[in-house]
């Protein structure tokens, strides 16, 4: 695999994570597929890269007290079983199913991002949490998505933390990074020794981490609305690429 291509993926993913937060990790798999990485390896590598990127983003947020540790650990722990089951299912699923499923996931997530960007601003304060049963079910579903598709799931975690756990948006965005770390680690367990090139993962992860830290400093130069519209549109465009891959896979 060409190092230049891997560096390009790391830079692109770092920009996405730095500018758009944890939700940017959804681009990892499409970008890796675009340079010829097989589907299972792309998903496993994505879990490593997004997990490392989340650690890099969590540290500065923790320093300013933005992370809700108890809620994040609880939500992440409730999703561990789903992440493990999702990974095991992905290793058994046919190529075409994973690709079409991921294309659909991109369409749904891109649409949600656009709707969120175009919606009126939500209240900044924490709200009342819903029932623990609902929290557990949502966390399990997020874990399944993380494990099966190899994505961090930030685009699902942030709305889940705000709507289900009643968390303010800025706290949910920071806390989602903690959940991503937990879910990604759990999802990697069934994939241990399977479909992973350590050199590829290391190059992309390090490049992503460096670029992401730099890009995060630029994010305040654009409005949340502009970033949301731009990223949602990009995710929808990437769904076409994955759909094309799925057609070629039969």
Feature annotation, model-predicted:
Residues 1-15, 29-35, 39, 59-148, ...:
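Juxtamembrane transmembrane-helix boundary motif
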Residues 20-28, 150-160:
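Transmembrane helix boundary and interhelical junction motifs in multipass membrane proteins
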Residues 29, 90, 154, 158, ...:
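Juxtamembrane/transmembrane-helix interface segments of polytopic membrane transporters
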Residues 39-47, 173-177:
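Small-residue hotspots at the loop-to-helix junctions and early N-terminal turns
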Residues 45-60:
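Transmembrane alpha-helices of multi-pass small-molecule transport proteins
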Residues 56-59, 148, 155, 189:
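Membrane-embedded alpha-helices of multi-pass transport/permease systems
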Residues 111, 174-188:
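Hydrophobic alpha-helical transmembrane segments of multi-pass integral membrane proteins
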Residues 157-163, 167-178:
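Aromatic-anchored, glycine/proline-accented short structural segments
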């Amino acid at each position: 695999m060409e190092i230049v291509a891997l560096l390009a993926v790391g830079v692109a993913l770092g920009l996405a994570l730095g500018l758009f937060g944890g939700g940017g990790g959804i681009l990892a798999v499409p970008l890796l597929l675009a340079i010829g990485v097989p589907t299972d390896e792309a998903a496993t590598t994505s879990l490593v890269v997004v997990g490392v990127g989340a650690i890099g983003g969590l540290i500065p947020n923790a320093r300013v007290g933005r992370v809700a540790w108890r809620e994040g650990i609880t939500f992440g722990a409730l999703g561990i079983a789903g992440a493990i089951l999702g990974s095991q299912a992905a290793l058994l699923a046919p190529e075409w199913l994973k690709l079409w499923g991921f294309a659909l996931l991109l369409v749904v997530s891109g649409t949600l991002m656009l709707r969120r960007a175009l919606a009126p601003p939500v209240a900044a304060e924490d709200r009342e949490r819903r029932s623990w049963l609902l929290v557990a079910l949502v966390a399990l579903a997020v874990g399944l998505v993380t494990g099966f598709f190899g994505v961090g799931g930030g685009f699902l975690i942030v709305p889940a933390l705000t709507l289900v756990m009643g968390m303010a948006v800025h706290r949910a965005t920071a806390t989602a990074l903690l959940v991503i770390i937990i879910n990604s680690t759990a999802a990697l367990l069934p994939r241990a020794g399977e479909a992973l090139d350590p050199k590829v993962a290391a190059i992309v992860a390090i490049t992503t981490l460096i670029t992401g830290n730099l890009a995060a400093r630029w994010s305040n130069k654009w409005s949340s609305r502009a970033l949301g519209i731009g990223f949602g549109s990009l995710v929808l465009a990437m769904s076409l690429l994955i759909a094309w891959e799925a057609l070629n896979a039969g």
